A protein has these predicted regions:
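Short, small-residue-biased leader/transition segments that mark boundaries at the very start
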Residues: 1-5
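Membrane-proximal topogenic or attachment-prone low-complexity segments at protein termini
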Residues: 6-69
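Residue-level signal for alpha-helical context at structural boundaries
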Residues: 42, 46, 96, 100-101
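Amphipathic alpha-helical binding modules
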Residues: 69-99
Length: 101
């Protein structure tokens, strides 16, 4: 039941994101989904900074097309959103692994 509340809370908070963040969100979630597999660097104890930057760059390359003045601010937003999402997924991954083992 706690997991349901966590998910509802998270979904609500995403629903009140500013417009720019809402436009970035699908690209960020798609990239995180793509990286979510056993052995992925996103589950490493200390994910490689270069790989994280490359991941964010792939998101930026898609998201910048929708912005009038993309730039460093957009990359900063993408990095913050992506790292937050990775933290959430890493916690979920650990909790699932605890239940299995």
């Amino acid at each position: 039941l706690g997991d349901v509340y966590k998910r509802q809370d998270y979904d609500y908070m995403k629903s009140i994101y500013p417009d720019t963040a809402k436009r970035v969100l699908p690209y960020m979630e798609e990239e995180c989904d793509r990286m979510e597999y056993d052995g992925s660097m996103m589950y490493d104890e200390y994910p490689d900074r270069l790989q994280l930057r490359l991941m964010c760059r792939r998101i930026y390359d898609k998201a910048e097309k929708e912005e009038e003045n993309p730039g460093a601010w957009l990359m900063d937003l993408i990095e913050v959103m992506t790292y937050q999402e990775l933290c959430r997924r890493r916690v979920e991954h650990r909790e699932i692994r605890k239940k299995i083992y």
